[in-house]
């Protein structure tokens, strides 16, 4: 039988690996007047095509053809449309008839460009942006990602991994410089188990989305308040049929449900609960816990469509997380306790404005609450973020235009005590009160115009933003050009100016800044491509340069905007598809320097003149991902990644005080940790029981060879000896099963 899959909601658990959520692709469909659809996909010569993805249009359900080109989808509503697609071929639609049992014969023709099937004004391919598009299937099929979108993005060229978390450090930029949008609404806290370097899991489950676009530099004037990158998440649309799925594994359990409401509405709901005790019983951790990491999340959405009023979608998400884990920092050893709550709501309305234009309005916000205690640090944090965006896009002939406005309001309240010296959780140098009551708002307007003439596509954009806290207006011009060289080859160039408001963490009322300017950056990107992302072979190489100004920098009064820096590098991405192998190779080189103080490192080091390597400067990284269909039932995937260790500041001595030993630090980030390397493996098996029950079994191994990667150094009490901090993620095994029933 052919290999059949479809999608659903995976458990929200930090140790949940991609094998588990691959199971969630199997969904049950329950709908009146359905058809059991079988068929064969072949090329123009009549030969069967294996590995073709046959998708039920407008849903997350799909099947994959077997060696003989055959596929089957049960419970498909009559009148529905299937879309068959495979790299190197043009996608082909097929409509399901009213017969109780339908068989389709689909022929794919050779081609290189995937046409849009979205029902709205078409947008041209961005001419000079570093854009990568991922689906939930891409995420779960990448070994070692634990079915997490942020971990999948860490495997891309240009993204540096500096610890065991999922923070996105893009092309020499800090994790805070990445803008995350969900249905046009800003997600101000896009990580779970949040840390200063991001977090240990993404807050948005990939199965809440129909896809994600990740732009690593040179992005257009459509996006503001970001210095480095943009992650734009698109939620699932209206369900076309009823779906239900239940999944269980070592890390947790989950259930999801989706159903249409009449012919123009629909609802989705999902709930996940982690079971950490079972996971850690099978995979003991070298780290000590007095409260195992755990939590739950629930999500839901409502969609309504009207030919006259347009479409409206409202999505809500609620999450709870907690952990109590032993922390080693400098000479301190103690437990870190954290409890978090996160709620997100996003609403999006779209309506055609004439035959060539589309109007879009997004509005929503997220609310984040967190309590943290470790050593002398004790903080209670509350932050609410509200954002809105309105756009009008369309055009005619060779012209395309986009105009709009956006804005957001952030209210931050933090109260507690922190070490006087950043990172001194033992309080050797003392502690002090920490209080933030900060409000800021930003409003922007933007316009982008592009024109294609022969092999040349040019784009020019301009945006202006008002930052209230700094009482300034910024103007950012941006431009890009793509030149087609023929033979599926092209050259891309982009240049632009970018601004972003500084983090509220710099505005401590005790020793923080009173006013900081908006940070700024200038991007220059030059790229070469051969092939197309939808083709059998695709390659991209990009070189870039970034200049930073007005970065926060510590001074006697707290912080000023006197910091600056730069980064330069190159990224390479290669993708090749054979009949029995899907191979992706990537690599990056990076040189970055900054004169800048992270908020949590205030008074930690003696700052020299000039610049130094930031914590996230990883000079090189290389990765390879291979996916192999063993048979119609079994699929195997493996990944390998290596990278230079991150820089760190060594302790070169200590001074004994009444409270203990205070470290004497060497030059900032003058040493480097050992090289990082990791191999991950996963396998899955899918079977059907009758026509209405599908089961998938999965297993995986993270860090297959058990390498002890080092992300931090700790010291003895007098700083006379140092040791690598134990990894919280050694070799880990996972098994589970997902069952879906079609009624």
Spans of features found by a protein language model:
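Transmembrane beta-barrel wall of Gram-negative outer-membrane proteins
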Residues: 250-273, 287-322, 336-359, 396-399, ...
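Periplasm-facing N-terminal accessory domains of Gram-negative outer-membrane beta-barrel systems
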Residues: 29-127, 160
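Structural signature of Gram-negative outer-membrane beta-barrels, strongest in the C-terminal barrel
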Residues: 309, 317, 393, 398-402, ...
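Short strand-turn segments of transmembrane beta-barrel domains in outer membranes
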Residues: 198-202, 210-220, 227-259, 269-273, ...
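C-terminal beta-signal and adjacent terminal beta-strands/loops
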Residues: 633, 642-659, 676-678, 684-743
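Membrane-embedded beta-barrel scaffold of Gram-negative outer-membrane proteins
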Residues: 360-364, 370-371, 484, 491, ...
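Periplasmic N-terminal accessory/gating domains of Gram-negative outer-membrane beta-barrel systems
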Residues: 88-92, 98-105, 116-220, 230-232, ...
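Gram-negative outer-membrane beta-barrel transporters
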Residues: 452-453, 457, 545-547, 562-652
């Amino acid at each position: 039988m052919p290999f059949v899959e479809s999608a659903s909601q995976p458990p929200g658990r930090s140790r949940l690996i991609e094998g588990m959520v691959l199971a969630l692709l199997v969904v049950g469909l329950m709908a009146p007047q359905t058809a059991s659809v079988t068929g064969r996909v072949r090329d123009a010569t009549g030969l069967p095509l294996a590995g073709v993805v046959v998708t039920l249009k407008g849903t997350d359900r799909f099947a994959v053809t077997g060696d003989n080109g055959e596929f089957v989808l049960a419970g498909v509503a009559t009148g529905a449309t299937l879309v068959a697609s495979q790299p190197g071929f043009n996608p082909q639609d097929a409509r399901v008839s009213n017969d109780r049992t339908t068989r389709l014969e689909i022929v794919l023709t050779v081609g290189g460009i995937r046409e849009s099937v979205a029902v709205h004004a078409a947008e041209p391919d961005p001419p000079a942006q570093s854009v990568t598009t991922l689906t939930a299937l891409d995420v779960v099929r990448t070994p070692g990602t634990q079915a997490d979108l942020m971990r999948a993005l860490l495997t891309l060229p240009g993204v540096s991994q500096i610890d065991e978390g999922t923070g996105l450090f893009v092309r020499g930029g800090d994790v805070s410089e990445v803008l995350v949008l969900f249905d046009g609404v800003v997600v101000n806290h896009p990580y779970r188990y949040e840390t200063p370097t991001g977090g240990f899991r993404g807050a948005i489950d990939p199965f809440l989305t129909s896809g994600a676009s990740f732009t690593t530099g040179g992005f257009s004037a459509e996006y503001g308040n970001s210095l480095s990158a943009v992650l734009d998440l698109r939620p699932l649309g209206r369900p076309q049929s009823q779906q239900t799925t239940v999944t269980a594994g070592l890390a947790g359990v989950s259930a999801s449900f989706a159903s249409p409401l009449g012919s123009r509405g629909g609802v989705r709901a999902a709930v996940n609960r982690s079971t950490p005790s079972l996971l850690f019983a099978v995979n003991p951790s070298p780290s000590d816990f007095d409260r195992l990491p755990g939590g739950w999340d629930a999500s839901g959405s409502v969609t309504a469509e009207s030919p006259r009023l347009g479409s409206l979608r409202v999505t809500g998400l609620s999450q709870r997380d907690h952990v109590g884990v032993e922390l080693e920092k400098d000479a301190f050893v103690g437990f870190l306790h954290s409890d978090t709550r996160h709620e997100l709501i996003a609403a999006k309305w779209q309506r055609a404005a004439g035959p060539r234009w589309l109007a879009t309005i997004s509005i929503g916000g997220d609310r984040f609450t967190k309590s943290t205690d470790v050593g002398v640090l004790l903080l209670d944090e509350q932050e609410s973020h509200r954002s809105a965006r309105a756009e009008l896009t369309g055009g005619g002939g060779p012209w395309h235009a986009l105009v709009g406005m956006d804005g957001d309001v952030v209210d931050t309240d933090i109260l507690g005590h922190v070490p006087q010296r950043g990172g001194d959780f033992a309080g050797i140098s003392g502690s002090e009160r920490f209080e933030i009551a900060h409000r800021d708002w930003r409003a922007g307007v933007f316009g982008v115009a592009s024109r294609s003439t022969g092999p040349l596509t040019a784009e020019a954009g301009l945006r202006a933003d008002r930052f209230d806290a700094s009482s300034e207006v910024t103007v950012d011009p941006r431009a890009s050009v793509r030149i087609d060289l023929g033979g599926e080859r092209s050259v891309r160039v982009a240049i632009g100016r970018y601004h972003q408001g500084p983090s509220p963490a710099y505005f401590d009322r005790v020793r923080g800044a009173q006013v900081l300017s908006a940070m700024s950056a200038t991007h220059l990107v030059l790229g070469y491509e051969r092939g197309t992302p939808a083709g059998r072979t695709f390659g991209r190489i990009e070189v870039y340069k970034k200049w930073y100004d007005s970065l926060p920098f510590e001074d006697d009064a707290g912080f000023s905007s006197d910091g600056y820096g730069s980064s330069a590098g190159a990224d390479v991405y290669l993708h090749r598809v054979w009949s029995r192998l899907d191979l992706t190779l990537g690599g990056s080189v990076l040189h970055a320097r900054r004169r800048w103080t992270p908020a949590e490192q205030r008074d930690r080091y003696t700052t020299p003149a000039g610049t130094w390597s930031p914590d996230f400067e990883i000079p090189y990284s290389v990765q390879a991902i291979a996916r192999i269909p063993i048979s119609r039932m079994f699929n195997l995937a493996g990944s390998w990644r290596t990278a230079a260790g991150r820089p760190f500041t060594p302790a070169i001595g200590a001074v004994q005080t009444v409270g203990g030993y205070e470290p004497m630090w060497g030059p900032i980030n003058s040493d480097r940790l050992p090289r990082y390397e990791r191999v991950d493996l996963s396998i899955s098996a899918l079977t059907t029981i009758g026509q209405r029950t599908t089961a998938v079994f999965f297993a995986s191994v993270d860090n297959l060879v058990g390498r002890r990667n080092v992300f931090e150094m700790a010291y003895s009490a007098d700083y006379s000896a140092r040791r690598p901090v134990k990894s919280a993620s050694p070799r880990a095994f996972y098994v589970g099963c997902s069952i879906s029933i079609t009624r």
